[in-house]
């Protein structure tokens, strides 16, 4: 049987959480997060503390509680979740179960098939 293909659109906070939950539910699934921005799992609720001077390094908003930066490498090594950052979803075809996307830096376009889509 083929592995279930799960695509998560959005990589700020809820997207990576949903992808991580999907991984716990299915260790064999092919999971991909597509994120328009360059940051993954940004704790944006911490911005007031950063602006207020409670810490100096904005990148702390990207870290796990033990200080590990949650970037593409982290999601692959720790959870076997593929990430596409700086990538915008440009179309969703629910009948064909595909998403079309464009890398905002290179301009490269692509298509990904899914069994489950999380937005």
Identify the function of each model-found stretch:
Residues 1-7, 69, 73-119:
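FAD-binding core/adjacent interface of flavoenzyme oxidoreductases
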Residues 2-84:
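Beta1-alpha1 glycine-rich phosphate/pyrophosphate-binding loop at the start
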């Amino acid at each position: 049987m083929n592995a279930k293909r799960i695509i998560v659109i959005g990589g700020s906070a809820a997207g990576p959480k949903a992808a991580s939950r999907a991984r716990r539910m299915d260790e064999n699934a092919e999971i991909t997060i597509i994120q328009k921005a360059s940051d993954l799992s940004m704790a944006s609720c911490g911005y007031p503390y950063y602006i207020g001077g409670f810490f100096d390094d904005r990148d702390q908003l990207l870290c796990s509680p033990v200080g590990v930066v949650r970037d593409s490498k982290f999601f692959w090594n720790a959870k076997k979740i593929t990430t596409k950052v700086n990538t915008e979803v440009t179309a969703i075809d629910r009948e064909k179960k595909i998403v079309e996307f464009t890398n905002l830096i290179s301009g490269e376009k692509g298509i990904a098939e899914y069994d489950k889509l999380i937005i």
